[in-house]
């Protein structure tokens, strides 16, 4: 019988996002990941398979959250133009005043992986398609 997981998966993924965002995939070592998430290496491997598995789950979690926020912001106003303006205003505020000031995680990751990883490429394509659909809808309004 395996041990029961005793950690908040969402909190671990959010912490992992911060490490990967700040350092990039290659720059994020397991020691740093374990320190920030509070997990030991065995727990990371048991829960996510390996660093790559953790990265994919963290990236998907981030992109899902970001897509929801973006779509909600774009749809928050009956005027598509106002929704787009609200989205970009919030983006500027987040970039200038937020704790995460390392560029765009998705763009950084696309550059780092250069679309050579099929799992990550699929996640990027799904995320970008969601955003494109939301932005197109706002433009059409």
Question: Language-model features: where?
Answer:
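Hydrophobic alpha-helical connector segments
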Residues: 57, 71-101
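Amphipathic alpha-helical segments used for helix-helix packing
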Residues: 83-84, 98-122
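Amphipathic alpha-helical packing segments from all-alpha helical-bundle domains
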Residues: 82-86, 118-141
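Helix-turn-helix
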Residues: 11, 15-53, 57
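Short, basic, alpha-helical segments at the C-terminal edge of helix-turn-helix-like DNA-binding modules
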Residues: 60-66
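N-terminal intrinsically disordered/low-complexity leader segments
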Residues: 1-7
